[in-house]
A protein has these predicted regions:
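Structured-RNA-binding interfaces characteristic of tRNA pseudouridine synthases
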Residues: 2-274
Length: 274
């Protein structure tokens, strides 16, 4: 959650606006605001506060790390009834003018008072993209990990079932972020696929869970790549999870290949703004 700016006073907030946001994370120090750093949340807050002419409290569905992208991040902002009168068209045009060119608000919803993009999310989905070949990706290079060596997708897929269900994922969490915090999460889906982007064949790993730990997806990918390189067997994934120790897992995959793909909410909660 991002704290409000030091404006005069905050009015009575009777409803919530929810924004679907896309961004290229290459130039940002992550989503969450940090002193002296350029962040996605900082740019969004400044743009929205400029339009509303007051401080806001901004909550996101998931805080992405530096260099991670999003096609459907969600943020919620409490607003007044009067501010709900601003039309969808007005919001989209204003945000297009006020935000940097690598951040876009693509949809605006209204929701009940107290709705939270974070706490009302039922699941989040991430996709990691890998170019596992010796030819450099060109047009897709900013959103993939160029691995240079082919990976055994069948072996990596065989390791994925171990990730499913509710369990302790401490082995995949950045050590400092796990201290004194719960590390159990529930993963509903983890699977490999392929897509073509700008004529380039890309290997994809998609994962859906109720929530994710700091660097969890990237460390899972790094662990799977160890298996895909035949350095480890698929059964190793179970050993890594059971260890509950970051040193048991593989390296953290580069941020550039990870994209926050979307969030599942109760459809009745969000109504597209007129």
């Amino acid at each position: 959650m991002t704290a409000p700016s030091d404006f005069n006073s905050i009015p009575e907030l009777d409803a919530t606006l929810v924004f679907r946001v896309a961004y290229d994370g290459s130039s940002y120090s992550g989503f969450a605001e940090q002193p002296g750093q350029t962040t996605v949340a900082g740019e969004l807050r400044r743009a929205i506060e400029t339009l509303l002419r007051r401080p806001i409290v901004l909550t996101c569905a998931g805080r992405t790390d530096a260099g991670v992208h999003a096609v459907a991040q969600y943020i919620s902002v409490p607003v007044t009834d009067a501010e709900l009168a601003l039309t969808r068209r007005r919001w989209l045009r204003a945000m297009d003018a006020l935000l940097p060119k690598d951040i876009a608000i693509n949809e605006v919803y209204k929701a009940r008072k107290g709705f939270s993009a974070r706490f009302d999310a039922r699941s989040r989905t991430y996709t990691y993209r890998i170019a596992d070949r010796d030819a450099r990706p060109v047009l897709s290079r900013g959103a993939v990990w160029w691995h240079r060596y082919p990976l055994d997708v069948e072996a990596m897929s065989a390791a994925c079932p171990a990730l499913l269900g509710e369990q302790d994922f401490k082995s995949f969490c950045k050590v400092a972020s796990a201290v004194g915090k719960p590390t159990h999460r529930c993963v509903m889906r983890a699977e490999f696929g392929h897509e073509v982007a700008f004529g380039e064949d890309i290997l994809t790993f998609s994962i859906e869970g109720n929530a994710f730990l700091h660097s969890m997806v990237r460390t899972i990918v790094g662990t799977l790549v160890e298996i895909g390189m035949h350095r480890r067997e698929p059964e190793w994934m179970r050993e890594v999870i059971d260890a509950c120790d970051r040193t048991a897992a593989g390296p953290t995959a580069p941020a550039c290949g990870l994209t926050f793909m979307g969030v599942d909410y109760d459809p009745a909660e969000l109504v597209v703004l007129d």
